[in-house]
Amino acid sequence: MGVKSIGQVTAEGTNAAGDEIEATNAREADADSTIAELVSRARAAMGIFEHYDQERVNEVVQAVAWAIIKRENAEELARLAVQDTGLGKYEDKVDKNRRKSLGTLQDLLDPMARSVGIIEVDEEKGITKIAKPVGVVAAVTPSTNPAATPANKTMMALKGRNAIIIAPSPKGASTCKLLLRYIHEELSKVGAPLDLVQALPHVDKELAHELMKQADFVTVTGSGNNVRAGQTSGTPNACVGAGNVVSVVDSTAEIEEAARKIRTSKTFDYGTSCSNDNSVVIEAPVYGEMVEALKREGGYFCDDEERVLLEEALWPGGGKRSSETLCKAPSVIAEVAGLENPEAREASFFMVEGKGVGEEDLFSGEKLSVVLTVYKAANFDEALDLTGRILHYVGRGHSCGLHTTSEANVERIGQEIDVCRLLINQIQVFGNGGSFDNGLDFTLSMGGGSWAGNNIDENLSYRHFLNITRVSRTIPEVVPTEDELLGSYWSRYGR
């Protein structure tokens, strides 16, 4: 075999680079044309839909809701989701598909939730608000909720007379395809254009990125990479990311009730939700009592050796989160970790002692599993400090909870902890995204405000899918005097 000359190597390298560039350009051109076709069909459907009155729009929203609330549909979607993603628990996904969709429908059918034409008139200020669509919505959805999240976003988008194109996760694509079939069946019944709701023809990163560029509005729920892609797409967006819920149990809490609620939150759907409790910070006077109550609820407290085994099962070699234990049944986690104690094998969830915050203790972050990190705080001051540090590490702006009977403590944590949701004596996984026993909007996408680098600091709702025209009419002129506005300042500091 002859030795290649430098010229030969350079030429072949240049040709290879050129071929790669051509292939990339071809893929981008294909993505551009594929998305352009989807968007064109969406706009044509919107051309019909924008003439619907509020009653017909609400009927379309009901159609989408029924596509997933219908029990046999909810069950088949849940079965397929667990089968294809390997994440979560079938029974809980059925409940999530139905409960979240029913709650969202309740919000959207509220007589005050107007989204067509004139939605508000303020006679005193002479302002009339007229609701209009934002346009074609690109919705990137996660594998953890491959049916409930796209259905939720579709209901909200259609409430505003928009069209929506869904970019599912690779593992959730088949579930999304089935959901789309169910939705189209219901849209046909009410005579609505089917192209109001579409999905990418196949899962492809370039298609998803091109969709975010060509759409009028982007909403992303999922991984940090997808959220960043949405935020940097150049398109107006509502993109939300990681949670890492911390629940504080103070010395005044109803212990048994708090333990039941934390267990329910921790174990639901095997921890797929960003709203499940990841850590609990317990005041020292009730620490032992609370841990025992959590054990009675099915929790298993790992000793130091078992903690090491569990950490290796979640983060092999201290690296990337292992898919083997992600959103899996506790029996699977026990098997992977090599936990031999029969009580561990039968546990509903696992507890580990919190030994630090940040990279020094990976258990202080979001785990997406039935593992709860338990911290002891000497007093409420220390509990707040710990909570703040944990959320600063992961989950800034998202949410936390407090189990208490002290209104003074409620006010303190509300003032001192920078989150957009603070739930008092609630099941975090149900309450964060709206519940029938609280006043938050039902959603599966929760903004964390500027703390989280998000554009929204509330639960995603239909209002985020509206543009508002504000018609301003003249009103009687009232010009304040300088004395009225500056008098208090002058009296204190002079002119």
Region spans (language model):
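Short beta-alpha connecting loops at secondary-structure transitions
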Residues: 167-168, 244-248, 278, 446-452
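N-terminal Rossmann-like NAD(P)+-binding subdomain of aldehyde/semialdehyde dehydrogenases
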Residues: 2-127, 156, 296
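Conserved C-terminal structural/oligomerization subdomain of aldehyde/semialdehyde dehydrogenase
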Residues: 27, 50, 339-495
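Rossmann-like NAD(P) dinucleotide-binding subdomain of oxidoreductase/dehydrogenase enzymes
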Residues: 116-257
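Structural signal for hydrophobic packing residues in well-ordered secondary-structure cores
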Residues: 43-46, 50-53, 61-72, 81, ...
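ALDH superfamily catalytic-core signature
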Residues: 21, 29, 151, 227-358, ...
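Short, flexible turn/loop "capping" segments at secondary-structure junctions
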Residues: 38-40, 239-241, 270-274, 361-368, ...
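Flexible, glycine/charged-enriched surface loops at secondary-structure junctions
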Residues: 51-59, 76-78, 193-197, 270-273, ...
